[in-house]
Regions:
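N-terminal short leaders/motifs
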Residues: 18-34, 81-84, 153-168
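Extracytoplasmic/periplasmic sensory segments of membrane signal-transduction proteins
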Residues: 38-99, 108
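Juxtamembrane extracytoplasmic/periplasmic/luminal helical "stalk" adjacent to the first N-terminal
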Residues: 2-55
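A broad, low-specificity signal for short, low-complexity segments enriched in glycine/proline
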Residues: 7-10, 36-41, 89-105, 124-131
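Residue-identity detector for glycine
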Residues: 10, 45, 54, 83, ...
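Solvent-exposed, extracytoplasmic
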Residues: 60-71, 102-170
Length: 171
């Protein structure tokens, strides 16, 4: 009787472990799809935004606001010229050295940066998509994604088994 109990429990343990492993793999695939679905519209809408870099904020601000409103996961969009954040979809005209609020930016390469908000909802987690315009990387477009919404979308299908998500970006 004891041997039967041990064998039954062992088989049940292995079976449940396999189910949990499959659920984890399914969740990982779902998470990648969610992130792709969030980032793809940013990439598709970047060319009109790149053309705005260098334009006066009075001309670009309305376009930035409309673009940010059309992308549900975007918190804000900002234009950077010569390393200075000069126009934001939320604040309008600005004059802030980008390195002061985001030390990893500007960059000569397209970057995805996980950071914390230092302007609007201070301390809240954000995901920044940076698109440089110039070879020096000092000019570009910064799109700030609301990461709280991304994690909710990732946890959407199966909350009971997986209750928390850790997102690692970069190195």
């Amino acid at each position: 009787a004891l041997l039967t109990l041990i064998i039954t429990l062992g088989r049940r343990f292995i079976s449940q472990r396999n189910v949990n492993q499959q659920n984890t793999l399914n969740f990982a695939a779902h998470s990648v799809n969610v992130l792709d679905n969030v980032l793809l519209p940013l990439e598709k809408g970047r060319n009109p935004l790149l053309a705005l870099v260098g334009a006066p904020c009075s001309q670009a601000h309305l376009v930035l606001r409309k673009q940010a409103a059309s992308l549900q996961t975007v918190r804000s969009i900002a234009l950077v010229k010569d390393g200075i954040l000069y126009c934001s979809s939320i604040f309008g005209n600005r004059d802030v050295p980008l390195r002061e609020i985001q030390p990893a930016l500007p960059s000569a390469e397209t970057k995805l940066v996980l950071s914390t908000d230092k302007s609007l909802l201070k301390g809240s987690p954000i995901l920044i998509q940076w698109y440089p315009v110039s070879d020096s990387g000092e000019d570009g477009v910064m799109q700030i994604v609301n990461i709280d919404l991304i994690t909710r979308l990732m946890l959407e299908p199966q909350r009971p088994l997986i209750t928390d998500v850790a997102l690692t970006v970069g190195e």
